[in-house]
Amino acid sequence: MSKRTQDLATTHANGSVDSATAPGASKRRRLADPVLDTPVELLASGRRTSGRHRPVEDASRQATQQQQAPGTPGGRQQRRAAAAAKESLSTPKRAPAKPKEKTPKATPKKTPSRRNGRRRSVKVEEVEEEEPEEEEGPEEEEAPEEEVEGDDEEEVQVEEEAEPVSLTPLEEKKQELAKLISDNDSRVRLLFHLKQFVSLVFYDPAEAKQDQSSVWEQVSMRESIIGTRTRLTQFQQNYDLWTKYLERKTGGHMRSTRRQIRSKQGALEDDFVIKLKEEMTAVEEEEEEELVEEEEEEEEEEEQEEDEEQEQQEEEEEEQEEEVTSRRGSRRSAPTKAKGKSKTASKTSKSKSKASSKSKSKSKGKGQARASKLSKSRRYVNAVDSSSEEESDYDPNKPYDVSKEVWEPIDTGWLLPDSEDEYYHFDDKFAQHMFPNGVKLKLNVSLKPPRVTHPAHLLLDVAEGQTPDNRERLEGFMSSFKLLDEEMTLEEYEEHYERELETLDKINEMKREGVLQGLADEEEGESLTVAEIRRGFNDPERSTRPTHWDHVVAQACHFAKLMADERKAHVSQAKRLAAAVDQHFRRLEGAEERDKKAQAKLLKTMARKMAQDVMRRWKLAEKVVLKKKEQEAKEEERKQGKKKLKEILENSAQLLEARVRGDNDTPETEEGEKEEVEAVSDDAMSDVDMEDDREQVEVDTRDDDELTVEELRAKYAALDNIKVERAEEEDEEDEENGDDEDEDEEEDDAEIEEETETTTPALETPIDTPAEEDEFSSDTDITLDSEDESSSEQESDYEAETTAPGLAALMGGPKAIEEDEEEDDAFVIKEEEEEVEVEDDEEEEKADTEVDRKVETVSEAVGEAVEEIKSNGVESKPTSNGVDVTELDRVTPERAPAVEPPFLLRGTLRAYQQLGLEWLAGLYNNDTNGILADEMGLGKTIQTISLLSYLACEHHIWGPHLIIVPTSVMLNWEMEFKRFAPGFKVMTYYGNPVQRREKRRGWNKEDTWHVCITSYQLVLQDLFAFRRKRWHYMILDEAHNIKNFRSQRWQSLLHFNTVRRLLLTGTPLQNNLMELWSLLYFLMPSSRNQMDMPGFANLKDFQEWFSRPIDKMVEGGVDEEAKTTVSKLHQILRPYLLRRLKKDVEKQMPAKYEHVVYCRLSKRQRYLYDDFMSRAQTRETLKTGNFLSIINCLMQLRKVCNHPDLFEVRPIVTSFVQEQSVITPYERVSDRVKSLLVNTVDGGYAPSEVSLSFLGFNAELEDMSTHEATSFRKYHNVQTVKNRIRELEKFCPAETPEEERYNDIEGHYKHMHHASFQQVIGSLKRVEYLHQIALAKKPVYGRNLVEVCTINTSRLQPDRPEETNESSYHWQLTHLRHPTVQECANNMAPYIERFACITPKAVTLNMAELSLGGIGPILQQRYFKQVTPKKSQRVVVGPPAAIADPFHQAQVKLSIAFPDKRLLQYDCGKLQRLATLLQDLIAGGHRALIFTQMTKVLDVLEQFLNIHGLRYMRLDGATKIEQRQLLTERFNTDPKIPVFILSTRSGGLGINLTGADTVIFYDSDWNPSMDKQCQDRCHRIGQTRDVHIYRFVSEHTIESNILKKANQKQILDNVVIQDGEFTTDYFNKMSVHDMLGLEPDDDAAPVADTLNLSGKNLERALAQAEDADDAAAAKVATKETNLDVEDFDETQKENNKGATPGSRSTSATPMEKENTGELSSAMDSPTPVATPDVAVDNGGGDDDDSDSDESDSGIGHIDEYMIKFIEDGWFW
């Protein structure tokens, strides 16, 4: 032990021993935290530790415990000790009493000390003691020494004082606190060693203090709570007492305020220590005086209180409060707020005592008294110890040098030292460092009896003044265990092992008996977990088994509780009764007053209700008046709207008249036009003149037969002008007559209607000259077909919507003409129509044509012209621009066109395209904008290019022109310009922002480019650049996508700086008037400069004029008002709209025939179809009506109809293989024995091995040498096991103990012990026996002897030739023996080749042995390469590979059966029909397109075409877009490819397959629009042959039922609606039972009832039922179809909702703000206001008299009076 450690050990004043040294302390210390419990608890509560941590009572502790409060029995002794301490402090020269025990002489020494100018000396005894000699032995330790480093480096030993009074209470508290800190440091040291050194067995505190390792020396400087820097290791910081105490007081918050820090610093000054001592002395004197003369002190305090001034009292109170706060802060180490500035300690102790007495008397009950009382019982630590001040080198005025100190804290921990001196080590420097400048700590010590919950918690009875001997306990503890890997011998380990086995056996036995119920049974496979083991067990508690007295006490308590509850119930019931009686009498007292209040309240309620009724009546009358005024305003507004409509009609008529005049070149036509106009006006004045004119018309009609077409056209060119003037006259008459209809007009309309019904409409007769035919059939001329329309397939979806009646039919929709066979059949030309016609569409088209024809005949003059044309037998069908359709088809070289084709245009325009150019040129010449709405594929692009070429050639206007198109067709427009008008400089505006900025650079220069082509999206992105530039023509392609006037796109494009505007659309205009108004208003602002139409009508007026009549027409009811209104709308649209259909303008287009081919199901298809329908799951699915499940069922049935391999693949047949045959176990026993025992030479086989082990010969060990056997026995010593067995037999007697007894624990343990020993002995004997058997084996001769005796003869004799023939005589007689296996195989080979085709159901592997007998193993050896031992191979036949397997051919034929490839066709009825159809088509020179929905069907078709050897091409959804054009061009140019198989999901952009003239639909798509697009790929402009469409339908299946129902109800076109999304209309109209051909079931739910999906969700549902490839292809096709959706996505819809589109200047806005977005129909006539019938019941019968009086007086009814009163303005 080091000297430093010895010195530290002697610094303890009392040498007390911790409770851990007491007996049982080791166990108790394991239950508590060895580090934190005692110090933290002591600091937190200010009390001493509990019993288990309490030091043993020695002399010093007895003296400390006697210092009690004044109120306790030991108070007088405490007062004496306080007086002695006071005396010692007041007289520093007096030396303390010397101890009487044997101690060395101490020399007193005076040490001067200066505190605030005061000088005093303190005597310190220098004790010198000789160091005892070190003795060897485990029980003796070195005597501790203490070395105090000073200037002279003297060795000083502090004397242990025997008398407890010799130390002052302040010093005693200081020593106790230092001990606590030292103990904590020792425990931290021990805990550090336990955590760092896991295998720690013994712990020496003195040696631990010498630990200078790098782990422990990782020191970090930390600012301590008391303002100094404390040196603590990282490990010590976790267990710092000050930190733990502060965290407990402050809840973990350690940060102090500045004021608290300043107060602490002021409290820790040197002079404050002296002040504390003086105050302590004053307090003690005050306490002594209070006990003796309490009354006198109170009188003195009152006198002093009266004399002192108020300010002096407040200052002293603040000072006293600051002192108390600083004391608490020093004791708790927690920051507290100081209430005043710190005062200097200049006042005397007497004034301090007076101030404290004053504060005590003034603050009784408010907290100051508590502080005064605490000062009596608390003691403070003296920071400056006179005994250590002189000897230590610590200077309080200088910071403590931590680097010079070597820290050696000591911890007791669990393992206790051998002596008391080694346990406690105290250093003055350590105390001064931890508590510099006199830190004040308050220790409130109160002992509580320990809680005893275990017998081990009881303390040992040790005589007073004696110390228990802990060395024996420590040695016993250290010897109570041994380390298994270090301190135990083999014998001890075996004994330990035996004890553990016995313990486990006892535990298992107790578990079986149920004693240990908490533990799991190992036999059941359960065991304790690590967490359960670590959890441990609870300490035993007191037994809960009740005794008789417990029952008596419990009964008494229960009875007492019952009595108390009964008493409480009685009291509560009495209270309730008293309250009820009191409430009753109170109610009787105020009954009259309450009645009065209720009556007054009732009157108020009645008055309020009556006032509300009257006010409600006035409000109702006010609403009636407002409604009347509103109706009057609407009537006035309607009149203004009619007036405005008239102006618009007049402007439209003028524009149309100007157009017609421009078409007529000769002056003769103009003169005839004037004459006819005058004649029409005269005919309108008199009926007689009208009849004369009709006669003249008849004469003219007879002369028309002799006129040519040109003369007829010139003759009737002014019909439109006549019609316009007649319409103007009718409008003037309507305005003059008001709302009454003109009778003459009704009669005229009736006559026109009758004449129209009696006439026979005829189809226009195309009069085509041979030259014209050559023009359209010439291959050299560039025909402008529909190839330039890349979005034709996209526009085809909108054609299905044109069949609905309404505005679409009136603006150039399909006009199917009625055929009347009763009239003149000579003038009717029959068109070739489709084989499957849609009757409902024909009826709708006929109705539309009839309405259109009625609307166009709006004047009598037009009716006369129709009569004249009818007389000639040809009806001229007017189009939307007033030009007859007959003119469109009769443009021949004989008639010079009004507008010559521009020379910049390369190519020849068709007739209708030439007329389109003329119409567009007329729009430009008349300063009007328009809409070109030709059907898709008619060449709107080339007509637009020709218009721009016309402007460049005729008007010398090259641009700049802006063409805005969808993104997908930008490249197509550029290619068309380069193809047909290469003279234009075209700039395609696209790319990223940087590229677009480069293209805009210099574009304002003239002739940089002429035409700019861009997309809708880029226009919005670069709106600032496009809006600044002035454009001559702005052309919008796909203009139907800007029909929403609230969108940002519409509003942005509306304000572009343009001269003219043109809209292109292939979609017919819908019945939505708002969309129509949006397009028309988009065109109108351009006409504002010429004031032809000063702005278009606002949306409200437009809806009032046309919405109600259109709604009636859609609903089916057509009246005169509707017809008149629609005629006006048609007249407005005529100058701005041109729409033509294919069948009207293109008569050269080939016909289209559709055939339905019914295919029978094959036998396999019918089986699978019926089997699927008969399943219970299928029927249950159809009953539930779940849409997704039904779609899945339908998809499976369609797979069966297309090909059965799609539903269930034809399997590859193989045999079931078994190892043994069924008869193998039942073979005869004799045959089995013979096969094992008999060794045949020629036909049998010898055993492969000979075993002699059963005879005792270890022949298998002959490969081992004798030396190896000896070495093996040498290194496997069995003697050790034998010795171990003998030792165990000696230890455990062989005789068996008494029978196992469970009632005797000792006997049971003996039996268990003996059984365990016998078990171990038995196991060792078995090991010995096995070792002996293993070591007994040895070779008979050995390998070394055999090698010595072996002679190699291979080199002496040559090799013998192989024998190829058997030497047996019987083998040479071939006529007597059976044929060999090879001979049999050769003989049966032809039969096997021809007839071996049926694969057996099962085969076995041992049939060869059973069927071939003894030769079977030989065959297996030779042909299956099973090698036998060399000893048995006497005859060598040859290498096994050279012999052919005789069973190979039969195995190949019978082992596996692949389905024949020809079954692919014969398993499917559609493929059988397709084979014959393709044979006929190819023989006729036709080429076919085969479409299917499923991708797997394409795979089947590929196999089918490969079987037949036909060349084909394939296009499916996986084909890239760039490859599609290559495939289509190759197919169109290569006639050697007859078949093209495609998927309906392969997309529609850029596919033109006019090279084929036959379309075969192998199956129909879910979406019929897909099939329609497929037809359009072949049947389109450019096709020269008739197109035949074959649709394959499996009869008596779901496909035939769907087609049948579709033909009956016409629901096929209703599957698809707007935007290409699916709806449930198709499934709502057709039930599942109709599709499957089942009987109707009332329980089955319709599909629509269980389906509530939107279009997208429904599309996903259909995709789930399809294959993954088909679903992916459909997704790609939809994406391509909707490629331009993002261009027209209304991203700003919400922002622009309700926005009103304005004009380009300050002109009137198109909509009124209050009516923005209103779509309801306006009222055409004022609605009469119904007067509400309201009567007030007054409860009497005088109402009649009052009403009669009012009527007599002229006032009238009260309602009329109120209305009149409000109308006069008196109400507002």
From Swiss-Prot:
UniProt KW keywords: Activator, ATP-binding, Chromatin regulator, DNA-binding, Helicase, Hydrolase, Nucleotide-binding, Nucleus, Transcription, Transcription regulation
Keyword Nucleotide-binding set for record: yes
Binding site for ATP: D934, E935, M936, G937, L938, G939, K940, T941
EC number in record: 3.6.4.12
Gene Ontology MF terms: ATP binding; ATP hydrolysis activity; DNA binding; helicase activity; histone binding; structural molecule activity
Record-annotated Helicase C-terminal domain positions: 1470-1623
Domain Helicase ATP-binding: 921-1086
Cited Pfam families: Helicase_C, HSA, SNF2-rel_dom
Gene Ontology process terms (BP): chromatin remodeling; recombinational repair
Region named Disordered: 1-170, 282-402, 656-854, 1681-1757
Compartments it resides in: Nucleus
Compositional bias segments (type: Low complexity): 61-71
InterPro entries noted in UniProt: DNA/RNA_helicase_DEAH_CS, Helicase_ATP-bd, Helicase_C-like, HSA_dom, INO80/SWR1_helicase, P-loop_NTPase, SNF2-like_sf, SNF2/RAD54-like_C
Biased composition (Polar residues): 7-19
Keyword Hydrolase among record annotations: yes
Reaction(s) the record says it catalyses: ATP + H2O = ADP + phosphate + H(+)
Biased composition (Acidic residues): 126-163, 282-323, 665-695, 727-757, 770-800, 818-847, 1740-1752
This protein's GO CC annotations: cytosol; Swr1 complex
Chain ranges for the short sequence motif DEAH box as given in the UniProt record: 1037-1040
Biased composition (Basic residues): 107-121, 338-379
UniProt domain HSA: residue ranges: 536-609
Function noted in UniProt: Catalytic component of the SWR1 complex which mediates the ATP-dependent exchange of histone H2A for the H2A variant HZT1 leading to transcriptional regulation of selected genes by chromatin remodeling.
PANTHER family tied to this protein: HELICASE SRCAP, HELICASE SRCAP-RELATED
Family label: Belongs to the SNF2/RAD54 helicase family. SWR1 subfamily.
Quaternary organization: Component of the SWR1 chromatin-remodeling complex.
Name of this protein: Helicase SWR1
Lineage of origin: Eukaryota, Fungi, Dikarya, Ascomycota, Saccharomycotina
